[in-house]
Amino acid sequence: MSQNQVPKWIQLNNEIMIQKDGKFQFDKDKEAVHSYFVDYINQNTVFFHNLKEKLDYLVENQYYEEEFLSLYSFEDIKEVFKTAYAKKFRFPSFMSAFKFYNDYALKTNDKKKILERYEDRISIVALFFANGDTEKAKEYVNLMINQEYQPSTPTFLNAGRKRRGELVSCFLLEVNDSLNDISRAIDISMQLSKLGGGVSLNLSKLRAKGEAIKDVENATKGVVGVMKLLDNAFRYADQMGQRQGSGAAYLNIFHRDINDFLDTKKISADEDVRVKTLSIGVVIPDKFVELAREDKAAYVFYPHTIYKEYGQHMDEMDMNEMYDKFVDNPRVKKEKINPRKLLEKLAMLRSESGYPYIMFQDNVNKVHANNHISKVKFSNLCSEVLQASQVSSYTDYDEEDEIGLDISCNLGSLNILNVMEHKSIEKTVKLATDSLTHVSETTDIRNAPAVRRANKAMKSIGLGAMNLHGYLAQNGIAYESPEARDFANTFFMMVNFYSIQRSAEIAKEKGETFDQYEGSTYATGEYFDKYVSTDFSPKYEKIANLFEGMHIPTTEDWKKLKAFVAEHGMYHSYRLCIAPTGSISYVQSSTASVMPIMERIEERTYGNSKTYYPMPGLASNNWFFYKEAYDMDMFKVVDMIATIQQHIDQGISFTLFLKDTMTTRDLNRIDLYAHHRGIKTIYYARTKDTGQDSCLSCVV
């Protein structure tokens, strides 16, 4: 492509990298945004004389749903839009504007013209959340236009649209051990995938390869055959060609098929075995870590023989208690393995392909508030959703199915930097909780019965956070420092406090709690023990100054909250989890999730041109605080995630960043340290090719 064919905004964006006086020209990105609007967005946005004409057109032509708009008078709707436009919001970087208009803004059916600006999308989402309450809609507008809170991609993309996918993006399905159950799980996975959801499945109950069916030995194909079916199903069923279907399979490490399961992700694997798009995760109980640490032989088990012997599925049982009994029981079929060799294989595979994800099962369940419903047995596609589940049993045509509890989770994220600048933790957490609750209550997924049942019974939501590294760097705090952990400790304690408080307030307002609340550690009061006995306020003066003007809940406040919950209960069974925040963090001009950045200046290729995205807030005076994840001490990153994790009732999508010079032994050491520090899950392991490094720090 010749220079004059490259759009002006791309040329300006590229000029960031042309040094002037030995420094990058970060201001060129603002010029690129200006050009993008003047030369492209404004030229390609459909013109309407006024808001009335615009809304009438969008409703009549089936772009917007009429139902939620009809809850308001036109004057009220106008007020909400006025609130959004009064902010005079400007995208600070080309990438943030490009991501919004490319991925989220409503366009004409032929995709050629733009029908929504950022303010329009926010107003529509706010009107949808507020359900007829104009004042609340304005509060939501302010929350989103100030970029204090960001709904997840499916919610932000779909809310208010007539032709849309679901507002919930994340589903977890239990799979029972019969052909009826397996085929029903594949069917439900395809239905959810069609709605744009990512689906993860627990395969730990399935018979291992070579187990008996109706006492006929060597009859079963094992979990890999089911994985192949799922792999094809997700590739077939996507959201009308817009979002690709995506799925994950989890397996307990004590399942006999664990080696075959891992081999599906080997780069050299045979086509008959390899799964191309299905992600995989391994569930590791403490017992396995103990056997590896002591360098003892371990056994993996044929799960159906356990079910026949004990009447319970292996993944529902406590391995610390049952492992030796399984080993000693001659009726439980088993195979001997070397646990260290298996951990080495896990490390090798992760440095090769990034998979599998890892869930340390006992770290999850030691602090799980709802073990009375079920322990947590698997996670989701991004390894941050951790909830109780109960397997369904699908019978033949004229018999009644037993519907269990599957999992759905609707997500959203606080933008730490803006919440801290506006000193609005309490307000933001409570409004965000309300918006997520509305999404949960309006979601009704009819073709996934156990998801539908659980959504009504469990009322789970997942509030997360983004821009941790950006906030720390712009305040001159190194991500790996004790001060950074001190900030995170206080901030996430406060998020937890206000999230519990709002959940209890909603329970009081509605006179309703989540199903089986009575057996939870919220009801017994045990959940609050550490908070009424430990002060989580900042230890460093610099960090205390950041919270100036905000009330930090004290142990006394926690005692009062404990009493309030004892009186009114909790509306949500699960409240907090930290998702990876991919494209949505670009729109927010935010560093992703609570992870360190991967690059100070990202290079992206779109079509025939390159674009550059300097990390939000990056400047020559804070360059070294934007340290790249691959240059960090991963043990310190583990410490940061462990600090945050103690305040998050579910999980954190935690990526490991590895250099290609690391050995499998190095990775095993990080894993074992993560396990020791109480980390619940590890998402991808990303490996960087260090042979291509070039130093940019001299040109700031």
From Swiss-Prot:
Superkingdom classification of source: Bacteria
Residues flagged as site, Important for electron transfer: Y683, Y684
Transmembrane intervals: none
EC number, as in UniProt: 1.17.4.1
Listed CDD domains: RNR_I
Reactions this protein catalyses: a 2'-deoxyribonucleoside 5'-diphosphate + [thioredoxin]-disulfide + H2O = a ribonucleoside 5'-diphosphate + [thioredoxin]-dithiol
Class of the enzyme per the UniProt entry, highest EC level: oxidoreductase
Residues at the active site: N380 (proton acceptor), C382 (cysteine radical intermediate), E384 (proton acceptor)
Induction, as annotated: Part of the probable nrdI(ymaA)-nrdE-nrdF-ymaB operon. Expression is constitutive but low, dramatically induced by thymidine starvation which requires recA.
One function term, GO molecular function aspect: ribonucleoside-diphosphate reductase activity, thioredoxin disulfide as acceptor
InterPro entries referenced in this protein's UniProt entry, alphabetically: NrdE_NrdA_C, RNR_1b_NrdE, RNR_lg_C, RNR_lsu_N, RNR_N, RNR_R1-su_N, Rrm1
Keywords: Allosteric enzyme, ATP-binding, Deoxyribonucleotide synthesis, Disulfide bond, Nucleotide-binding, Oxidoreductase
Activity control mechanisms: Under complex allosteric control mediated by deoxynucleoside triphosphates and ATP binding. The type of nucleotide bound at the specificity site determines substrate preference. It seems probable that ATP makes the enzyme reduce CDP and UDP, dGTP favors ADP reduction and dTTP favors GDP reduction.
Disulfide bridge positions per record: C170-C409
Site (described: Interacts with thioredoxin/glutaredoxin): C695, C698
Record site feature (Allosteric effector binding), residues: D177, R207
Pfam families: Ribonuc_red_lgC, Ribonuc_red_lgN, RNR_N
Binding sites annotated in the UniProt record for substrate: T153, S169, C170, G198, N380, L381, C382, S383, E384, P580, T581, G582, S583, I584
Gene3D superfamilies listed in its UniProt record: 1.10.1650.20, 3.20.70.20
Site, as annotated: Important for hydrogen atom transfer: C170, C409
GO CC terms, sorted: ribonucleoside-diphosphate reductase complex
Assembly mode: Tetramer of two alpha and two beta subunits.
Family according to the record: Belongs to the ribonucleoside diphosphate reductase large chain family.
Protein function: Provides the precursors necessary for DNA synthesis. Catalyzes the biosynthesis of deoxyribonucleotides from the corresponding ribonucleotides.
Name used for this protein in its record: Ribonucleoside-diphosphate reductase subunit alpha
Organism encoding this protein: Bacillus subtilis (strain 168)
Gene: nrdE
